A protein has these predicted regions:
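Active-site loop-to-helix "anion-binding N-cap" substructures in soluble metabolic enzymes
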Residues: 1-77, 159, 186, 224
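ATP-dependent carboxylate/acyl-activation modules
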Residues: 68-297
């Protein structure tokens, strides 16, 4: 890989037999000493000269084999993932290189379909899209979330239609919503498109589980910014993530399970003595969802 070989040349050099023999020997460490590191030669030779290798040494050698073959397989996996990914124009800043590499399990953004037309999704677009989808996943359908700089600046649920939710979410902060990323967890129809294509509106990305053809045509040919709009279809919007989340830190990775608990799935407990007005229950749940997804004050 470092030498710049072609795809076929690199595939040809993937070792199958070597790791298999090492793993087979390591599995039988109780009877076999397997050496994959030249630094272990002297200790193995010393014990052999004394009559035979100890069980403790053989176990240490086996552990090193499984770690080494695991690293080898991981390196191959990362290389394959790189081939399946997409380079982005740049990262958070113009001087940073960036790319998007979907998981092998085709879910969420990794299974999203960017519909024909529109500009390429940028690194920041992907971040905002992830934030919008994560928030709308915590809301009952139909709901809409408007995100700017990874933070929700508008969100609403409706008992009527996705268009109604969209209108209410936009009205939360129309100024911040200008140039935002919007996610809806219901079908995006022509009514939604006509609202979004109205005066004093502009969005970078629209995401929904499904779109009417008439809605797409209206957006592409209506507002001036429609030809550049990224329209993203994510069929499993509304699903729980149920995945490990990792964050790169200097010298390692922090890993935790995804926070899939939504305020709309939990029982509300009143901490004070004043009972909650039932008419405000959805407002309280919505506020809790937004607090969960806000990254600044």
């Amino acid at each position: 890989v470092a030498g710049g070989g072609s795809f076929d040349e690199i595939i040809e050099k993937i070792d199958i037999g070597g790791p298999s023999m090492l793993r087979s020997a390591a599995k039988n460490y109780s009877s076999v000493a397997v050496v994959c590191d030249t630094h272990d030669y002297s200790q193995v030779i010393t014990e052999l000269q004394e009559g035979g290798t100890s069980l403790e040494l053989r176990q240490q050698l086996a552990a090193k084999v499984f770690a080494r073959t695991g690293e080898y397989d991981s390196a191959i996996g990362r290389w394959f993932a790189d081939q399946a990914g997409a380079s982005l124009r740049y990262g958070e800043n113009p001087h940073q290189q960036a790319g998007f590499y979907p998981d092998s399990q085709a879910v969420g953004l990794g299974a999203a379909t960017v519909l024909d037309g529109g500009k390429e999704l940028s690194y920041n677009n992907w971040l905002d899209l992830d934030g919008a989808v994560a928030a709308v996943n915590d809301l009952p359908s139909p709901s809409a979330v408007v995100v700017k700089h990874t933070n929700p600046c508008g969100a609403a649920l409706s008992s009527d239609s996705p268009c109604d939710a969209l209108e209410k979410a936009w009205e939360g902060d129309p100024l911040s919503a200008f140039g935002s990323v919007v996610a809806v967890n219901g079908h995006f129809d022509l009514a939604c498109a006509k609202f979004m294509g109205g005066p004093n509106k502009f969005v970078e990305v629209l995401a929904a589980p499904s779109f009417d053809d008439e809605a797409i045509e209206f957006l592409r040919n209506g507002p001036k910014w429609g030809k550049n709009l990224r329209i993203v279809q994510i069929s499993d919007i509304g699903s729980k993530r149920n995945q490990l989340e990792s964050r790169r830190v200097w010298g390692g990775n922090l890993v935790q399970g995804s926070d899939d608990i939504s305020a709309f799935d939990a029982n509300l407990q009143v901490a004070g003595e004043v009972a909650l007005d039932p008419s405000l229950e959805n407002d309280v749940r919505l506020a809790q969802v937004l607090v969960k997804h806000l990254k600044s004050n």
